Regions:
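Active-site acidic/histidine proton-transfer and metal-coordination neighborhood
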Residues: 2-108, 118
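Gly/Pro-rich active-site loop or hairpin
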Residues: 6, 49, 85-93, 100, ...
Length: 154
């Protein structure tokens, strides 16, 4: 299951290649940021994935993307669920663990207001935690009413 965290090295490699292509395209357009949302990295049933293996794969993948594009800011956008029933990177805590383990200066987070409400997190607290660490690279503001991500404007 998953893309960057997939336990099949060929599939994870294809996902990593897409991230490299996104970085190249970002540079071509004169941009400086790439947001990675891991919609398929997760699970539907307990013990469906090897959690440690996926964590390690994701850390290595983020390190590789950051090393490939040291001139760009790479954002992780976490979400509690959708497309999978349970997303792997689903909270501010796990996102922070990934950031710490990857240990790359250009890796940070995009906080999505709706995603935080879906997980019953406090947006002000998340903003403070990532902001004080210098890892808050973006904020997405939309509604969702705290139960699903319909992506409608506020």
């Amino acid at each position: 299951m998953g893309d960057l965290g997939n336990q099949d090295p060929a599939l994870a490699g294809e996902a990593l290649k897409l991230c490299y292509e996104a970085c190249d395209y970002c540079r071509t357009c004169g941009g400086d940021t790439v947001t990675i949302w891991l919609g398929h990295d997760g699970f539907d049933y307990s013990f469906q994935i090897d959690y440690t293996h996926v964590f390690d794969n994701l850390v290595k993948a983020f390190q590789a993307v950051c090393d490939y594009a040291p001139d760009l800011h790479i954002f992780i956008e976490y979400k509690p669920y959708e497309e999978r029933s349970y997303a792997y990177i689903d909270t501010m805590g796990l996102t922070r663990m990934i950031l710490n383990a990857a240990d790359r200066e250009n890796l940070g987070v995009t906080l999505d207001y709706c995603h935080m409400l879906m997980k019953h997190e406090n947006p002000a607290m998340a903003t403070d935690i990532f902001g004080r660490a210098g890892k808050l690279y973006g904020i997405h503001l939309n509604d969702g009413y705290g139960v699903m991500d319909d992506g409608l404007m506020i």
